[in-house]
Amino acid sequence: MATHSTNEFRGGLKVMVDGDPCSIIDNEFVKPGKGQAFNRVKFRNLKTGRVLERTFKSGETLPAADVVEVEMQYSYNDGEFWHFMTSENYEQHAASKEAVAEAKQWLKEEALCMVTMWNGVPLSVEPPNFVELKITETEPGVRGDTATGGTKRAKLETGAVVRVPLFLNEGEIIKVDTRRGEYVSRAK
C-alpha cells in the first residue's frame, strides 16, 4: 500500500488516520528554534465529517486512503438516501445524509456530481461548480428602488436561498455558483 511522508502533505490529499479515510484541509510545517521539526495537520474524517487536528514528526508517514473520485448522475432522493448512477455501467449507489451534506441544496435530477467512494460506499458528494435552477419564490422588484444595484432573496427549486438582482422574477432560470452560493447570471 502506498504511503505519504509529511513533506508530501498538502490540501486535498487523502490519507488513512486511525483506520478512517481523511482529507487534509491544512498543513503547516513548523521548525522550532530548538527541537525537531513537525507538521501541524488539520484534516476532515470522510466517514464522519468531523474536522480534527494532529501533529506529526517530520519524516513520519501515513498510508494513502484507497478512495476513488467517480463522476455520477444524481437520480432521486427517497427521503433517507440520495441515489446516484454511474455513466459507464449504470450502477446505482445510495449516499447518506452525511455524505451529501451541503451539496443537497444544489442537487437537481440528472446533475453530474463528483462522488468520493471508499470500499464501494459514497463518502462525499461534490455538486457541479455551476447549476441552472428556477426561482420559485421572490418578492417583486420595484423599479427605482435603489440608486445602485440592489439585491433580494430568492428561493430556488431545490430549496436553496440566494441573493439575486431586483430585476429577476419568479419562474426565471438562473445560473448559480455552488462553491460560493452566489448568483452568476440568467441562464441562456
Curated annotation (Swiss-Prot):
This is Elongation factor P. GO terms for molecular function: translation elongation factor activity. One of its GO terms (cellular component) is cytoplasm. CDD domains: S1_EF-P_repeat_1, S1_EF-P_repeat_2. The modification N6-(3,6-diaminohexanoyl)-5-hydroxylysine is found at residue 34. Pathway: Protein biosynthesis; polypeptide chain elongation. Signal peptide: none annotated. Keywords: Cytoplasm, Elongation factor, Hydroxylation, Protein biosynthesis. One of its GO terms (biological process) is peptide biosynthetic process. Its main location: cytoplasm. Belongs to the elongation factor P family. It is found in: Cytoplasm. Pfam families: EFP, EFP_N, Elong-fact-P_C. May be beta-lysylated on the epsilon-amino group of Lys-34 by the combined action of EpmA and EpmB, and then hydroxylated on the C5 position of the same residue by EpmC (if this protein is present). Lysylation is critical for the stimulatory effect of EF-P on peptide-bond formation. The lysylation moiety may extend toward the peptidyltransferase center and stabilize the terminal 3-CCA end of the tRNA. Hydroxylation of the C5 position on Lys-34 may allow additional potential stabilizing hydrogen-bond interactions with the P-tRNA. Involved in peptide bond synthesis. Alleviates ribosome stalling that occurs when 3 or more consecutive Pro residues or the sequence PPG is present in a protein, possibly by augmenting the peptidyl transferase activity of the ribosome. Modification of Lys-34 is required for alleviation. It comes from the Bacteria.
